[in-house]
Amino acid sequence: MTTIVSDSGMIRYKIITAEWLIYSHRNPPFWAFEKGIYLEKFDSLFHVDASIKADTAYYYEPKKLWELRGNVHIQSQRGDKFDTELMFWDQDKEKIYSDKFIRIEQVDKVLTGYGFESNQQMTEYQIYNNTGIFTVEDNAVQADSTQTSK
């Protein structure tokens, strides 16, 4: 099933899923995507802002909160790749976050950590308890440790 979702007359998302369950009479009402989801988020010019893939997802309508679970893969507009097992996207607060292990792959580095918080565009973020692999240029002249200063 492929669905286009609009908000205020603007196309915002394309959702591809095998099953979309809507629990409108539950408290709180929510959507369930228990057989996986692929979602593309569009900007105002209809460019793909981000793509999201997860094994399971829930969308809590009143809170405008997405809960993504299992093999969560996100690619930002800049091309950065985010991988985790659990991610929340709070649309009202325009914030994306997780308290689980996260791996972020950029062109020139890989960052990992436990816990993550980002703006909605995934351009500014903080990683907690982090480590990373990245290139460091070694252009500095090394001081001779055998010489003493006078």
Language-model regions: role of each:
Residues M1-K150:
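Mature-chain termini and adjacent capping regions
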